[in-house]
Amino acid sequence: MISNSEYHKEYMKGTTTVGLLCNDGVVLATDKRATMGNLIADKEAKKLYKIDDYIAMTIAGSVGDAQSLIRLISAEAKIYKMRTGNNMTPLSCTTLISNVLHGNRHYPLLTQLILGGYDLINGAKLFSLDPVGGINEESSFTATGSGSPTAYGVLESEYKSDIAIEKGLLIAVKALSSAMQRDAYSGNGISLAHINKDGVKLYSDAEIEGFLKKINRKR
């Protein structure tokens, strides 16, 4: 029988996620590898989720905890829209998630989250949340997971204020690509999205491959 502490060491974990604030929206990116100890448990793990028409979120940490939270928040966003006729704002969604996480602080959900969204009044917003509900509103970029030190190296050197989404997409892909080369717990491809005044766009594998080719040509 596995003890509770041993279980926490062995749960499926997501690893590298990135968020960038751009002048016309937000970019989010994740790798696709989930690990359980030294085992690659999933090569197609979903770590990037569309929550609402103008909100998306990345997960790192316990996949089960994060998926449970995603289901709850997605349902709450739909109920909010049905009742009010409006989409939940990124700040409101982040506050709701924070309250849920803080309510479980004695038995915390083992996950780190990045939430990106577009408020039709206040523009693009980027937030990060810790496992007990702490909120940081990011003014530039953020990264989570075991590959984040490498990703931060790329973000620090490449990111400039007031970049457009097109440039932000390339930086995010480059940061994830570098993390996957250096971190054993990151890999197996990239998930990518941007959020702007037109809503959430999730990129296909073919489109992401096109970004990787552009990056490689510049090296």
Swiss-Prot record:
The lineage of its organism: Archaea, Methanobacteriati, Methanobacteriota, Methanomada group, Methanococci. The keyword Glycoprotein does not apply. This is Proteasome subunit beta. It is found in: Cytoplasm. Keywords: Autocatalytic cleavage, Cytoplasm, Hydrolase, Protease, Proteasome, Threonine protease, Zymogen. InterPro entries: Ntn_hydrolases_N, Pept_T1A_Psome_bsu_arc, Pept_T1A_subB, Proteasome_bsu_CS, Proteasome_sua/b, Proteasome_suB-type. The 20S proteasome core is composed of 14 alpha and 14 beta subunits that assemble into four stacked heptameric rings, resulting in a barrel-shaped structure. The two inner rings, each composed of seven catalytic beta subunits, are sandwiched by two outer rings, each composed of seven alpha subunits. The catalytic chamber with the active sites is on the inside of the barrel. Has a gated structure, the ends of the cylinder being occluded by the N-termini of the alpha-subunits. Is capped at one or both ends by the proteasome regulatory ATPase, PAN. Component of the proteasome core, a large protease complex with broad specificity involved in protein degradation. Its EC number is 3.4.25.1. It catalyses: Cleavage of peptide bonds with very broad specificity. Belongs to the peptidase T1B family. One of its GO terms (molecular function) is threonine-type endopeptidase activity. The active site is at 15 (nucleophile). Pfam families: Proteasome.
